[in-house]
Design a protein with these regions (language model features):
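Helix-loop "lid/cap" segments that line or gate small-molecule binding pockets
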Residues: 129
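Core of compact, soluble alpha-helical bundle domains
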Residues: 1-104, 108-120, 124, 132-156
Length: 156
């Protein structure tokens, strides 16, 4: 059974043997206390994903016009996926989900095209657009995911 939180998922899987520890409860309380901001961030990302993507790619085209011209549809697809997975990861407060579900695969694909540097720039620009378009508290929740994308691409 999947829940909205990885800690709870893990504990439910082992419910016959373990109660939640004080530390687990503190983490769940922190999760619950921040949930309204997480939902707000998820909704904003969902509702503005296309605009965030387009604005980010326009900025990228200023630095890498040939790449964007040749790979526009692929760039849109990849960036849309990153936004979608980041929004769900923010909602779940689950960086591991983001890394396992998307980043390892994406880094390998981008590396095969030999455009990791350019794509890392794209995700830096994406975060700058998010910083402009979302309230600061929401943009701050997205930042670890854009940083993870940048690091995964540069280290691929």
């Amino acid at each position: 059974m999947l829940t909205m939180n990885r800690t709870l998922d893990e504990k439910i899987a082992n419910i016959d043997h373990v109660y939640l520890s004080d530390s687990d409860l503190v983490n769940l309380e922190r999760f619950a206390n921040s949930f309204s901001v997480r939902v707000k961030t998820y909704n904003l990302l969902r509702d503005r994903a296309d605009e965030i993507t387009i604005r980010s790619l326009k900025l990228l085209a200023q630095q890498y016009p040939e790449l964007v011209q040749k790979q526009l549809q692929r760039c849109k697809y990849d960036m849309s996926n990153v936004i979608r997975y980041a929004s769900l990861s923010v909602l779940r407060d689950d960086e591991l989900f983001f890394r396992e579900a998307l980043m390892d695969w994406l880094a390998n694909i981008i590396n095969s095209y030999q455009i990791a540097k350019e794509c890392s720039t794209a995700y830096r620009l994406l975060q700058s657009v998010v910083d402009e378009m979302l309230p600061a508290e929401c943009a701050a929740l997205v930042k670890p995911y854009s940083e993870m994308a940048i690091a995964a691409l540069l280290n691929a």
